[in-house]
């Protein structure tokens, strides 16, 4: 029997110190990504902790976090770099007096343009470059965590643009050439499944799916965020949520909604769930009016069942 420490458990413990409760698959994916130098594609429904995972990793490792929020129409000028046009214009005005004699002495248009060539490199040099999140991440001297959030909201052209960055930790700027990472960043891409991602992108990534948690895992997550929550109330909350997720709803409550609801119940000095209290606070869990209406008949039975099961003291379903 091996006496070697479990590296996966060590990753989960490290994330736990930041308040992020990681399942073994999450810790395993992170451990492999760190040692294989591969990005992680994190998929799953909204609100299960995909974005928060990047923040937790950065906090645990003591690294800066660079976040690129994807959206329709995103291109490399917004994601990689842009030129400081105001500074370029200012320098143009300052150098105007020096440029004028060169142009005045030129015998024609072609010689004048040739005389200006020496200045063009100046205006498209490092001092006029404004790094955006992707380039800023490559330039971090100690490395960083790079979050490319909601990649499914971008288009296929931007996805193709990312391939060089993900495979080689490098990007190409026409005026400056290829820029490689000082220290390769740990890259996480998140997707809510709005569209199918390309195979080329998937091949370059480790895949991690974060789904809705079991009651036992959700209780650990809520307790980490609300250390003072009464244990019996916590058990009732996660059991009620599990029952609510079994209903045929358009949008099931995620972990973020559970935490918000638990925080509200603590604020209201709740000791146990009641049907009336659940109805009054249901809008913290369900965000569609159709779901709120559809859930009404089940609220009282679910609240009573959660209270009864919580009071038995039996282990929560894992």
What function would you assign to each model-found segment?
Residues 1-318:
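C-terminal regulatory/interaction module of P-loop NTP-utilizing enzymes
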């Amino acid at each position: 029997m091996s006496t070697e420490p479990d590296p996966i458990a060590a990753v989960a413990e490290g994330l736990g110190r930041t308040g992020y409760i990681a399942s073994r698959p999450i810790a395993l994916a992170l451990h492999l990504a760190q040692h294989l130098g591969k990005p992680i594609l994190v998929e799953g429904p909204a609100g299960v902790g995909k974005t928060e995972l990047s923040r937790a990793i950065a906090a645990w490792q003591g690294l800066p976090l660079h976040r690129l929020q994807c959206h329709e129409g995103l291109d490399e000028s917004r994601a990689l770099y842009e030129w400081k046009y105001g500074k370029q214009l200012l320098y143009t005005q300052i150098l105007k007096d020096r440029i004028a004699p060169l142009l005045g002495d030129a015998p024609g248009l072609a010689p004048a343009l040739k005389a200006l060539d020496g200045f063009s490199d100046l205006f498209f040099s490092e001092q006029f470059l404004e790094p955006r999140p992707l380039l800023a991440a490559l330039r971090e001297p100690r490395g960083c965590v790079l979050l490319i959030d909601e990649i499914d909201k971008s288009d296929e052209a931007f996805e193709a643009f990312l391939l060089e960055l993900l495979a080689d930790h490098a990007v190409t700027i026409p005026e400056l050439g290829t820029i490689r990472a000082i220290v390769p960043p740990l890259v996480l891409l998140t997707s809510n499944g709005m569209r199918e991602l390309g195979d080329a992108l998937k091949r370059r990534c480790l895949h991690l799916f974060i789904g809705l948690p079991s009651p036992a895992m959700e209780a650990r997550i809520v307790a980490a965020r609300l250390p003072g929550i009464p244990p019996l109330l916590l058990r009732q909350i996660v059991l009620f949520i599990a029952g609510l997720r079994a209903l045929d709803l358009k949008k099931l409550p995620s972990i973020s909604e559970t935490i918000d609801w638990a925080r509200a119940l603590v604020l209201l000095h709740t000791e146990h769930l009641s049907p009336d209290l659940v109805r009054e606070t249901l809008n913290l869990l369900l965000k569609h009016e159709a779901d709120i209406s559809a859930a009404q008949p089940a609220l009282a039975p679910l609240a009573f069942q959660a209270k009864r099961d919580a009071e038995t003291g039996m282990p929560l379903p894992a």
